[in-house]
C-alpha cells in the first residue's frame, strides 16, 4: 500500500521506529506522550497491514520512507 495514507506525524514516528527508538524515546523526541506514540504505532500497523516492528521497517524501506 502506498504511504500517502500515513499522516505526517505517523511518518515521523515510522522513521523513528526505523532508527530503533523505543516508544518512550520517540515521545521524548517529539514532545508528545508515550500513549500518543502507542496510538500512532497502532494506526500505522493497521494502515500498512504490518504485524510487527520488523515488517514496519521492511515497509518503510520498500516505500522509500527510509533508506539503508
Predicted features by range, described:
Residues 28, 43-44:
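Short, contiguous strand/loop micro-motifs
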Residues 23, 41, 53:
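Helix-turn-helix DNA-binding elements, focusing on the entry/boundary residues of the two helices
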Residues 45-68:
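Basic, Lys/Arg-enriched C-terminal extension of HTH/homeodomain DNA-binding domains
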Residues 1-34:
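Helix-turn-helix DNA-binding segment
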Residues 9, 40-43:
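Residues within the DNA-recognition helix of helix-turn-helix
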Amino acid at each position: 500500500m502506498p504511504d500517502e495514507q500515513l499522516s505526517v506525524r505517523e511518518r515521523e514516528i515510522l522513521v523513528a521506529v526505523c532508527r530503533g527508538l523505543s516508544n518512550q524515546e520517540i515521545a521524548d523526541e517529539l514532545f508528545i506522550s508515550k500513549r500518543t506514540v502507542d496510538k500512532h504505532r497502532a494506526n500505522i500497523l493497521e494502515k500498512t497491514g504490518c504485524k510487527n516492528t520488523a515488517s514496519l521497517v521492511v515497509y518503510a524501506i520498500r516505500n522509500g520512507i527510509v533508506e539503508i
